[in-house]
Amino acid sequence: MDEALYKFLKWTAIALGCAWVGWSIYDSFMREHAPGDFEYKRAEQFFADDEYQRALKEYEDALDENPQHIYAMRGKARALLQMRRFDEAMAQYDKVISAQPDLGVNYANRGILFDRLGRYEQAIADYEKALALDPELDEGPHWLTRFLRNQPEKPPTIGDRAKYLRAELAKPPEQRVLRVPEIDEKQRTYKQ
């Protein structure tokens, strides 16, 4: 490695390190946080690690501190869904949708819940409402998100699922394949 390249790489590394430290200090100490934000961030980490019970506790702590914390409300609904506490998840999604009726991810996630409950017509309706509000949901996770999840292949989107359900529901009941549990359980909720 020649001297000029070495100096460039060294100073780039130093600059990036300083920028990261500066941002960390700003984000931790100087930026104002709404009540419940710290608990929400802890909950999101637990959720990412598939520790849904611990995530639920942190979401609830965030909501105790700030009952209107919409991100914690949505996170709580997602955690309840993953824990298969479907009735509680439905009540929470209904609350979230009444608080934010124009956000597509809310309908997408409730559609996933309807899908898991076998309420396919309602799932289709929510999937289509989600796509009408936010067409980008049909693109699925970004390549970087898939990389970080170690998910090399693009998973089916809610648009794909809605088309599949419509096609299956058009068949005679004895020919329908609406549920493949090992595939269906891999469907991830949306975060925004």
What label would you give each PLM region?
Residues 41, 75, 109, 143-144, ...:
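Canonical tetratricopeptide repeat
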Residues 48, 60-64, 94-98, 129-132:
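Conserved structural position within tetratricopeptide repeats
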Residues 2-19, 138-192:
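Terminal, low-structured helical/coil segments at or just beyond the last alpha-helical repeat
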Residues 35-37, 70-71, 104-105, 138-139:
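Helix-start (N-cap) detector for alpha-helical repeat units in TPR-like alpha-solenoids
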Residues 29-68, 75, 82:
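Alpha-helical segment of the N-proximal tetratricopeptide repeat
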